[in-house]
């Protein structure tokens, strides 16, 4: 048995690596429980300072549901913490993936005896244990634990992950488990945000949209219809949206897996939450409108990348610009939302678009990003 201080996190500074294309390898994964699978949270949901890294399976409101290994493999790690994942079990599989089971109440007798021996040896409830390939083998369908509510859990459930064993990136378990879960519901958009950037914001660094002189308009959406009037636009603009996904036979709300934005039928932005590294999960404050979250606890996902200008549109003609959002979940349910922005050159004044001189979003977000980059560099 090997004792290690913690997991080694990948250092991926390149922004494009935040949402890499997930190489899909077919695997014979079974469900971790033998009760009807219902989710309370899905992969990639927006959380405070991070993306949700797995699926939260409901356990019918109680602790003590049997948990089974989803495939053959070996226990590679047992972790016990007062917070976070609580009591968690990690199983490496020959197919190159690791399954993770968190917030457990207790382990099977065979695994629990190993855990207790280590806790007595270290004289500590909190332990982080690592094992070699031949120490604790398990078979697919073998009972390994009981569900619980340990650690930072807000109620009884099983937090379940699939990781790339080599890189430790987390991957959306619904890539394998979507056929097991009923979902006939489309994502829904609740609001559309339009950002208009002052011309000087791009003179020195095109794509740098964190200017303090940015005008933002937010229009609510209900039943896929705008509930207000969109602004006239000119110059460099970008968009954002507030949206959630839904599933059949449950009242929970979930994160949207795939967001695509089109201008005149040409895709100008794509966000696919299929896989990410734990280092890059902190970029959530970079792709969301932090002002809306800090002041109103509202998640607006920005449909542009400030570092390279992807998703930014230059409005330079007085005409209609036709946009289309396509939001999809892992089951293929797709919501299409079409809207038009009118390009209209403003009257020449000192502050023609009414850009605010101070933007809370810029101040908060700029400081947040600077702190993040200082940690990474």
Question: What are the functions of these language-model segments?
Answer:
Residues 1-5:
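Positively charged n-region of N-terminal signal peptides that target proteins for export
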Residues 11-21:
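Hydrophobic h-region of N-terminal signal peptides that target proteins for export
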Residues 19-98, 105, 125-134, 139-140, ...:
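Surface-exposed, glycine-biased beta-strand/turn segments
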Residues 98-133, 212, 217-226, 255-317:
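Exoplasmic/lumenal beta-rich domain surfaces
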Residues 189-210, 350-377:
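Compositionally biased low-complexity segments at domain edges in trafficked proteins
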Residues 248, 328-336:
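Short acidic/polar inter-strand loop motif in beta-rich domains
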């Amino acid at each position: 048995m090997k004792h290690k201080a913690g997991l080694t996190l990948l250092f991926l500074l390149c922004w494009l690596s935040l949402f890499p294309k997930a190489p899909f390898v077919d695997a014979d994964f079974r469900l971790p429980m033998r009760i009807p699978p219902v989710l309370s949270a899905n992969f990639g949901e927006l959380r405070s300072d991070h993306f949700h890294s797995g699926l939260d399976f409901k356990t019918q409101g109680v602790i003590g549901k049997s948990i089974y290994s989803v495939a053959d493999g070996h226990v590679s790690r047992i972790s016990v913490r007062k917070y976070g994942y609580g009591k968690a079990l990690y199983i490496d599989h020959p197919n190159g993936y690791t399954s993770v089971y968190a917030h457990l109440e207790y382990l099977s007798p065979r695994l629990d005896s190993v855990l207790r021996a280590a806790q007595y040896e270290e004289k500590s409830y909190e332990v982080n244990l690592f094992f070699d390939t031949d120490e604790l083998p398990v078979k697919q369908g073998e009972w390994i634990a009981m569900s619980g509510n340990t650690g930072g859990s807000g109620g009884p459930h099983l937090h379940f992950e699939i990781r790339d064993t080599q890189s430790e990136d987390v991957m959306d378990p619904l890539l394998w488990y979507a056929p097991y879960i009923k979902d006939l519901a489309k994502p829904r958009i609740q609001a559309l945000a339009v950002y208009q950037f002052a011309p000087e914001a791009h003179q020195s660094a095109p794509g740098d949209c964190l200017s303090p002189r940015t005008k933002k308009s937010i229009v609510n959406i209900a039943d896929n219809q705008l509930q207000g009037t969109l602004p006239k636009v000119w110059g460099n603009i970008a968009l954002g949206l507030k949206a959630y996904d839904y599933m059949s036979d449950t009242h929970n709300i979930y994160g949207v897996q795939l967001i695509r934005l089109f201008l005149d039928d040409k895709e100008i932005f794509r966000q696919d939450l299929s896989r990410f590294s734990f280092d890059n999960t902190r970029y959530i404050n970079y792709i969301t409108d932090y002002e809306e979250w800090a002041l109103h606890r509202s998640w607006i996902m920005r449909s542009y990348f400030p570092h390279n200008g992807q998703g930014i549109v230059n409005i330079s003609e007085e005409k209609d610009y036709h946009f289309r959002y396509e939001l999809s979940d892992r089951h293929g349910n797709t919501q299409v939302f079409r809207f038009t922005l009118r390009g209209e050159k403003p009257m020449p004044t000192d502050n023609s678009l009414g850009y605010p001189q101070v933007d809370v979003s810029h101040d908060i977000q700029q400081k947040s990003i600077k702190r993040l980059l200082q940690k990474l560099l």
